Amino acid sequence: MAKDIRVLLYYLYTPIENAEQFAADHLAFCKSIGLKGRILVADEGINGTVSGDYETTQKYMDYVHSLPGMEDLWFKIDEENEQAFKKMFVRYKKEIVHLGLEDNDFDNDINPLETTGAYLSPKEFKEALLDKDTVVLDTRNDYEYDLGHFRGAIRPDIRNFRELPQWVRDNKEKFMDKRVVVYCTGGVRCEKFSGWMVREGYKDVGQLHGGIATYGKDPEVQGELWDGKMYVFDERIAVDVNHVNPTIVGKDWFDGTPCERYVNCGNPFCNRRILTSEENEDKYLRGCSHECRVHPRNRYVSKNELTQAEVIERLAAIGESLDQAATV
């Protein structure tokens, strides 16, 4: 059956004059054609994911390609049955990718147009995965890695991308003298991060050109050596990559069983992304810890209108109580 919706993933590092006004004009156009999605605009470029029917997405691509400096912008296209977004957002930011460099010194930031790692095709990246002397580094957030990753890739001990530069500095001796290749969802983070590694003194740095999204669509590699699914920042949450021998690597936060279903912790002040089944979500009140389960603003409890007696009953079923010492 034909899929009626297209999802466009794209980015481009290119100087944008009067980027705030550009963002406002861009939003107006997107709304005028009924496009949905999320786009970031900065002085350094544009980064977005949008969705719509064939006609709408074609109008959008034609419009973007008509803009000065964006004639060759590369759209990565997925075909889906449903919209990937509910609304349309275009926001101006200082950067389309924030590296978390010291003192938020934007003048000291990396310009990928001047410094970036060598581009690797999907075939070249697959060869790097099979090379025991090459370090493969995942540059995404921890919850993205936990849902799916390249076989043998290093999972940095970080919660989010902004912590990665410091982690690399702390572990520099482990791979300073080795070939390092990095990857991310669509390539936008790696453009900047690989450039940062070059500036830090790494001599042989590569990046997967077009990211995981391109690797999964390549007719030669067909996503092989990817385990699990790829996390995406839209209503789909997870998409397939490996079309040769797919596997599940995600594990339920509570019992460790295979799982590819993400929810946010019920405690709004925690909001951690956790993998869990619907059964365990109900059982543990969608709280990633006891503290989050009993938090007075637990969203799962309020959404399901649970009484205190019902909360106490569910806590008792897992050996907990309202007044026990909190454990994180």
Swiss-Prot record:
Gene Ontology annotations of biological process type: tRNA modification
Gene Ontology molecular function terms on file: oxidoreductase activity, acting on paired donors, with incorporation or reduction of molecular oxygen
UniProt cross-references to SMART domains, sorted A to Z: RHOD
Keywords for the protein's UniProt record, in alphabetical order: Oxidoreductase, tRNA processing
Keyword presence, tRNA processing: yes
Catalytic activity reported: uridine(34) in tRNA + AH2 + O2 = 5-hydroxyuridine(34) in tRNA + A + H2O
Entry's EC annotation: 1.14.-.-
Domain Rhodanese: 130-224
Record's keyword annotation contains tRNA processing: yes
Pfam families linked to this entry: Rhodanese (PF00581), Rhodanese_C (PF12368), UPF0176_N (PF17773)
Stretch forming the signal peptide: none
Active-site residues, Swiss-Prot/TrEMBL: C184 (cysteine persulfide intermediate)
Function: Catalyzes oxygen-dependent 5-hydroxyuridine (ho5U) modification at position 34 in tRNAs.
Family designation: Belongs to the TrhO family.
Record protein name field: tRNA uridine(34) hydroxylase
Protein species of origin: Streptococcus pneumoniae (strain Hungary19A-6)
Organismal lineage: Bacteria, Bacillati, Bacillota, Bacilli, Lactobacillales
